[in-house]
Amino acid sequence: SVQWLTTGKGDMKSGSVTTLHDEDTVPEGFIEIPEYRVEFGCGDRCNPSFEEVSESKPAIYRLQWFRDHGLNPAHCKRLKVSGDSMIPILFDGDSVLCDCSSKEIISGKIYAFCFGGSQRIKRLFTKLNGGLIVHSENPNEQDEEIAPDEMDQFILIGRVVDRSGSGPF
């Protein structure tokens, strides 16, 4: 408990930790968010579609967490991180929760997107000329720029609103 951690008094293990087993149902006030793979069907304009990853276990979130963050869980998808370009924030194998209803870029936030045929998760900065700076957190990676006349190749999947995984903080 917080009291035990701060004062050494009280019950060490009091709290609201809930352990679920595979056969358990999700408790009231919680929701499962499965992991998805993003697929792109290209015509005149590529639009992402989401395929649920059946071999992955869903993450369980409190519904209150979504309310506290102003998010609708129906618009959120979990995606798997691949690569080391976002270390030390995101690590290979981590999962991120993306708000796929978010279609306006807030400069300095992390987004999942497709550009030039590749799917990425990066920090985006808006430019006054209408382009973007694509920033990797890994200091070994250089920033990229997307020029205003290249924005027709840019497809926003969603804003990253949470991460989970085994990478250190």
What name fits each language-model region?
Residues 66-169:
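Acidic/glycine-rich C-terminal interaction modules and beta/coil loop segments
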Residues 4-92, 154, 161-169:
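Short, positionally conserved secondary-structure boundary motifs
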